[in-house]
């Protein structure tokens, strides 16, 4: 995993908001410093209201970078996310970023990348695909949700869909779909898996990757109040890299991307 060092605390301006369905919105804002330094897997912490409510900033994966503009995907779950999703062009926001580490697209050597995501977990995958394509990697998306309303494929290519209710694509979950696909994919050359989504999905994927001997990195989600290691709101328990015992980690500092083998299943 690659770590980010060029962090800025910036005032930015929203240039557009667009509903993508399923209570998810695409928000674009201008912030040259963050756009210049963003890597796949990084996130930003955003405060939209200049008052003290909501008190904590909200973390969002960086979805895409276009020139000086940064795009995020946000799901309206009330509070700060509602303010952001309903904001109009010209709204001023406060943004810290880029934060966290990034997906490692260099090692171990691989020719095909499988990007597994669930629901809003597709958020970081567009920027990741762009960087992988620049390195001439084959990219396959495996995307899951409860129904077609949970599926978001904006900017993504070569997508394989799984829905639990069968309203789109394969009927079942992403692990079942991946299990059906993986044999043929592995025949084409070395594979590395990258993932973001609900914790149960990530834990199941960690087990599957271990079973198949696949290198796998996952982006974890938790509460991140400050994003810079001060509030200690994002502590997670992971296996030690040695494989023996566990230890606590500040996800905003040493994550959100971790090796899947460290997840406690």
Role assignments for model-derived ranges:
Residues 199-200, 221-256:
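Local cysteine-cluster metal-coordination motifs and their immediate loop/turn environment
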Residues 16, 64, 161-163, 218, ...:
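Structural signal for conserved beta-strand scaffold positions within catalytic alpha/beta enzyme cores
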